Amino acid sequence: MRKANYDRFPSTKISGTVIQGWENICSLLEEHLKAYPALAVDFYTGVYEEEVINELHRLSPALFIDTRDLMKPESEIKAMTARFMTDDVLFGYVTNITLNDYFDQDKLKKAREEVIATKGKVVVVGSGAAM
C-alpha cells in the first residue's frame, strides 16, 4: 500500500489558554470588558453566527452591533462583484475589492460614532467587526 504524501490529521501546537463552554467564555469576556468596555468579534466562514450572537447577549452590552446591518444592500454588492464572477463555481477573477467596500459608509460612520458615545459595554460582531 502506498504511503500518503500528505498529513491526514494536520495540527498546529499553540501556547495559551483554551476556554470551553459559553458560560466560561462569557465570564472571561466580562473580566476583560472591565478594563476596556469594547469587544469586537470577527467572524470567518463556517462560524455559527446566530449561536455566537445569541450567547454574546449574555454580556448585557449597552450597545450591540451586528456588522451585517452595516453592509450595503445585496443588490449593490452583486453589482459591485458581478465583473469578477464566472459560471464556474470554483474559479473567478482576482479582485481589488476590499472588505471596507462591502459596507455602507454612512452606516459605518454612524456605528463608529455610537461606539464612541456609548457609556458601558459595547459588543460588535460579524465580518469586519474591528473596522
Regions found by a protein language model. Give the residues of each.
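Glycine-rich P-loop/Walker A and Walker A-like loops and their local beta1-loop-alpha1 context
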Residues: 14-58
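ATP-dependent small-molecule kinase phosphotransfer cores
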Residues: 2-24, 51, 60-121
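Conserved beta-strand segments of the P-loop GTPase G domain that flank and frequently precede/overlap
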Residues: 40-42, 65, 124-125
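Short, polar loop motifs at secondary-structure junctions
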Residues: 126-130
